[in-house]
Amino acid sequence: MLDLFKAIGLGLVVLLPLANPLTTVALFLGLAGNMNGAERNRQSLMASVYVFAIMMVAYYAGQLVMDTFGISIPGLRIAGGLIVAFIGFRMLFPQQKAIDSPEAKSKSEELEDEPSANIAFVPLAMPSTAGPGTIAMIISSASTVRQSSTFADWVLMVAPPLIFFLVAVILWGSLRSSGAIMRLVGKGGIEAISRLMGFLLVCMGVQFIINGILEIIKTNH
């Protein structure tokens, strides 16, 4: 049981900086301004369900996609590292705030004409939460843990769905309490936390690239 908690904790530490619910909260506040409370709650729930589904598909079907297109693990790690590092750089040095982006503005204009517009899948679930960096991380991690003997087989079966479920629950809770979060930490606080997460993502991306290169060198020797 202790191994299960360790695996879940490790998974959350890896995924949460990539999923970054706080940036999704900032985007949600910009897009859902014209929605009533019930509609905001519905969008929050649907976004969380979509995120869970995307992560499950990436974990269990990602290897099949890799085999179909002939993608190697080192190649995936290097590509995932580049994506993660790029996302981290954008979070460290943002050009536009999420709520001021053209996508958010156009979505806000839609909401003025159609208050019940669906923003749960795009952009809240994808690409804001379960974006390319998150998906690459999940596929790479799935391939790694299946080859590793660190955890028992039953832990590797039970932990991933629980990790994805907890990420979805954290996102749902964050979106449900989006107004309170913004009032508590303020825009400056969210920006500071986002930049810290961006730095962590850059470090993780560089480590991904290093691991991929080392694996290529080891394979060719």
From Swiss-Prot:
The chain crosses the membrane at residues 8-28, 45-65, 69-89, 119-139, 155-175, 197-217. InterPro entries: Multi_antbiot-R_MarC. It is found in: Cell inner membrane. It is a multi-pass membrane protein. Keywords: Cell inner membrane, Cell membrane, Membrane, Transmembrane, Transmembrane helix. One of its GO terms (cellular component) is plasma membrane. Residues 29-44, 90-118, 176-196 are cytoplasmic. Residues 1-7, 66-68, 140-154, 218-221 are periplasmic. Belongs to the UPF0056 (MarC) family. NCBIfam families: NAAT family transporter, PRK10995.1. This is UPF0056 inner membrane protein MarC. It comes from Escherichia coli O157:H7. The gene is marC.
